[in-house]
Regions:
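A charged, aromatic-enriched C-terminal amphipathic alpha-helix characteristic of glycosyltransferases
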Residues: 149-179
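Short acidic alpha-helix that forms the nucleotide-activated donor recognition element
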Residues: 68-80, 103, 121
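Short hydrophobic beta-strand element within catalytic cores of glycosyltransferases
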Residues: 84, 103, 107-110
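Short alpha-helical segment that forms part of, or immediately flanks, the ligand-binding pocket
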Residues: 74, 96-103, 114-118
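Nucleotide-activated donor-binding/catalytic signature segment of Leloir-type glycosyltransferases, i.e.
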Residues: 48-69
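A conserved mid-protein helix/loop that constitutes part of the nucleotide-sugar donor-binding site
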Residues: 1, 10-24, 135
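A structural motif in glycosyltransferase catalytic domains
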Residues: 3, 18-21, 36, 137, ...
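Conserved acidic donor-binding segment of nucleotide-sugar-dependent glycosyltransferases
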Residues: 122-123, 127-134, 143-148
């Protein structure tokens, strides 16, 4: 199973939790059954700690940046099964990564933090975990790896959800007339 993290790489986005959950799953014998790829800018002052932890895990890799301004970026993102988003960053608002995940059909494991429950739907586009809970993250990842979660159905739900944010569905002729642009 292929997990992905796509955001700023920093502790407050849950990166340490992902790495610890990965380590625990590896200790339980799941190492050859999943991978975790990280994309994003590594926060200043976190590079050494992050690299030390990720380099100790054979199935976790830093992939650099994913260009989502090009279709190929979304094609690459769609190769993943689940996105990991165990954030507790106090500045978290409407995370644009949700739309990226929806477009690519990638459901996520996310914390019950900030506005996540307003945008994501438990069991359809996401699986929720409590904030600051590595064991809950590990368990949700294990359920996905073991096939206990219908990821394919969730992927379809994500793609359906993406339609709500498609500019062609949002900016209609009726809206343009209403705001007197047409």
């Amino acid at each position: 199973l292929r997990f992905v993290f796509l955001s700023r790489i920093m502790p407050e986005k849950g990166c340490d939790y992902i790495l610890e959950a990965t380590r625990l799953l590896n200790e339980e014998g799941y190492e050859k059954r999943f991978t975790v790829d990280f994309y994003g800018k590594i926060a200043d002052g976190y590079s050494c700690a992050f690299n030390e932890k990720i380099n100790s895990l054979k199935n976790a890799t830093y992939q650099g940046f994913l260009n989502l301004r090009e279709k190929e970026g979304y094609d690459q993102l769609s190769n993943y099964d689940m996105m990991l988003f165990p954030t507790y960053w106090r500045g978290e608002g409407f995370a644009g990564v949700f739309i990226d995940a929806f477009i690519s059909g990638v459901p996520m494991i996310a914390t019950d933090w900030a506005h996540n429950r307003i945008i994501l739907e438990d069991g359809k586009t996401a699986l929720f975990i409590p904030t600051h809970n590595v064991l809950a993250l590990k368990e949700k990842m294990r359920q996905c790896i073991s096939g206990d979660v219908d990821i394919q159905r969730m992927s379809c739900c994500c793609q359906n959800e993406a339609q709500k944010y498609d500019v062609n569905h949002v900016i209609t002729e009726e809206l343009l007339k209403r705001i007197e642009v047409m």
